Amino acid sequence: MQKRAIYPGTFDPITNGHLDIVTRATQMFDHVILAIAASPGKKPMFTLDERVALAQKATAHLGNVEVVGFSDLMANFARDRQANILIRGLRAVADFEYEMQLAHMNRHLIPQLESVFLIPSKEWSFISSSLVKEVARHQGDVTHFLPDNVHQALMDKLK
């Protein structure tokens, strides 16, 4: 039986920290779905279609990753995709409480849905899409934190 996992998030935009998590997940699971949430309430900088395209290009070298956009409830999306594992990245203790609440709610909705928490590599443990965008808005160099295609797209958005 194939182990299918979902790595959900807004990915606005996808960072090297996200790539670190998804790359490591590909070594643990047969198929990883990078599920990009529409998240209209967060007012993303990039449209859902743009975020999907950026992530597809950034993960093209990973043969067992599928990138899709979604707007459903995560638990229902996982059920529909026949995945029973959710991958979540934990950068700091502050992330844990929220992630634990999500994990419990998802498990309440679908009892067989497991959450697997991965800690990013030290190099990426402090970055977030929001922080990268904020630094870039103030002309800070964020080249190191983003895949090349994403960096170019961010610079184009900020022009």
UniProtKB/Swiss-Prot annotation:
Marked site (Transition state stabilizer) residue numbers: H18
Reaction it catalyzes: (R)-4'-phosphopantetheine + ATP + H(+) = 3'-dephospho-CoA + diphosphate
Annotated keywords: ATP-binding, Coenzyme A biosynthesis, Cytoplasm, Magnesium, Nucleotide-binding, Nucleotidyltransferase, Transferase
A Pfam family reported for this protein in Swiss-Prot or TrEMBL: CTP_transf_like
Cofactor list: Mg(2+)
EC number: 2.7.7.3
An annotated GO cellular component: cytoplasm
Top-rank taxon, per record: Bacteria
One term of GO molecular function: pantetheine-phosphate adenylyltransferase activity
Residues where ATP binds: T10, F11, H18, G89, L90, R91, E99, W124, S125, F126, I127, S128, S129, S130
Places the protein is found: Cytoplasm
Pathway given in the UniProt record: Cofactor biosynthesis; coenzyme A biosynthesis; CoA from (R)-pantothenate: step 4/5
GO biological process: coenzyme A biosynthetic process
List of residues binding substrate: T10, K42, M74, R88
Family statement: Belongs to the bacterial CoaD family.
Function, in words: Reversibly transfers an adenylyl group from ATP to 4'-phosphopantetheine, yielding dephospho-CoA (dPCoA) and pyrophosphate.
Subunit structure as annotated in this protein's UniProt entry: Homohexamer.
NCBIfam families named in the record: coaD_prev_kdtB (TIGR01510), cyt_tran_rel (TIGR00125)
PANTHER family for this protein: PHOSPHOPANTETHEINE ADENYLYLTRANSFERASE (PTHR21342:SF1)
Designated name of the protein: Phosphopantetheine adenylyltransferase
